[in-house]
C-alpha cells in the first residue's frame, strides 16, 4: 500500500510530467487559456494516460517480450494510444458535445501528446507490474491535470490584469509557467527520485 502511495505522490507532484520531465508542453500552453477547457483536456488525458499505461504494460509483457518484438515498442504503443483516443473522442462527442467542441483539435492530438507516449515508455523502463503501471499512469495524468488547471487559472487571472506590452501574451505565460515550476520544486523533498 505504501508503494502505491509513493508512486502516486512522486508522479503527481515530485516528478510531474510537465514541470519536471517537460512532456506535454503543447497542450499545457495551448489549452490553458480557459479553465473549463483545461479541466476537460485534463480529464480526457487522465483517462487516456491511465488506460495507455495499463495497455502498454500488457502489450509489452504479453506480446512484445515473449515474441522478442521489442523493436516494435514505439509503433505498437502509438497504435494502442491512437485506438484509446479514438474511443474517447467518440464517447465525448456523444456525451459532452460542448466539451468536444471546446477541446477542438487538441482532443485528437492527445494521440501525439508526448506525455502519453512518454509515460508509457517510462512505465516500461521502470519495470512496474500491471497495478503499478495503472497507478503510475493515473498519477502522471493527475499531475498533468493539476498543473494544467492551475496554469489555466493563472492565465485567466492574468487576462484580466493590465500586463505591460512587451510581456503580454506568450512572455507572461512562460514567466508564469516558470513560477509554477518553482512552486512545484517545493515538493522535491517529499519523495526520493
Swiss-Prot record:
NCBIfam families found in the cross-reference section: PRK05151.1, rnfA
Subcellular location: Cellular chromatophore membrane
Family note: Belongs to the NqrDE/RnfAE family.
Protein name listed in UniProt: Ion-translocating oxidoreductase complex subunit A
Transmembrane segments: 4-24, 39-59, 71-91, 102-122, 134-154, 167-187
EC number: 7.-.-.-
GO biological process: electron transport chain; nitrogen fixation
Keywords of this entry: Electron transport, Membrane, Nitrogen fixation, Translocase, Transmembrane, Transmembrane helix, Transport
Enzyme type, top EC level: translocase
Subunit structure: The complex is composed of six subunits: RnfA, RnfB, RnfC, RnfD, RnfE and RnfG.
PANTHER family: INTEGRAL MEMBRANE PROTEIN OF SOXR-REDUCING COMPLEX, ION-TRANSLOCATING OXIDOREDUCTASE COMPLEX SUBUNIT A
Main location: membrane
Membrane topology: Multi-pass membrane protein
UniProt lineage: Bacteria, Pseudomonadati, Pseudomonadota, Alphaproteobacteria, Rhodobacterales
Pfam families: Rnf-Nqr
A cellular-component GO term for this protein: plasma membrane
Function of the protein: Part of a membrane-bound complex that couples electron transfer with translocation of ions across the membrane.
Amino acid at each position: 500500500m505504501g508503494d502505491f502511495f509513493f508512486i502516486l505522490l512522486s508522479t503527481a507532484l515530485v516528478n510531474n510530467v510537465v514541470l519536471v520531465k517537460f512532456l506535454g508542453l503543447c497542450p499545457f500552453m495551448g489549452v490553458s487559456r480557459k479553465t473549463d477547457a483545461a479541466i476537460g483536456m485534463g480529464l480526457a488525458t487522465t483517462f487516456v494516460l491511465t488506460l495507455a499505461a495499463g495497455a502498454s504494460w500488457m502489450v509489452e509483457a504479453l506480446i512484445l517480450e515473449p515474441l522478442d518484438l521489442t523493436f516494435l515498442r514505439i509503433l505498437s504503443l502509438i497504435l494502442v494510444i491512437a485506438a484509446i483516443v479514438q474511443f474517447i473522442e467518440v464517447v465525448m462527442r456523444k456525451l459532452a458535445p460542448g466539451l468536444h467542441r471546446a477541446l477542438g483539435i487538441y482532443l485528437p492530438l492527445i494521440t501525439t501528446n508526448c506525455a502519453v507516449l512518454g509515460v508509457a515508455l517510462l512505465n516500461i523502463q521502470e519495470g512496474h507490474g500491471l497495478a503499478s503501471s495503472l497507478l503510475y499512469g493515473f498519477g502522471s495524468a493527475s499531475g498533468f491535470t493539476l498543473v494544467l488547471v492551475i496554469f489555466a487559472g493563472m492565465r485567466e487571472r492574468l487576462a484580466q490584469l493590465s500586463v505591460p506590452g512587451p510581456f503580454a501574451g506568450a512572455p507572461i505565460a512562460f514567466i508564469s509557467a516558470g513560477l509554477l515550476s518553482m512552486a512545484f520544486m517545493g515538493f522535491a523533498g517529499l519523495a526520493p527520485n
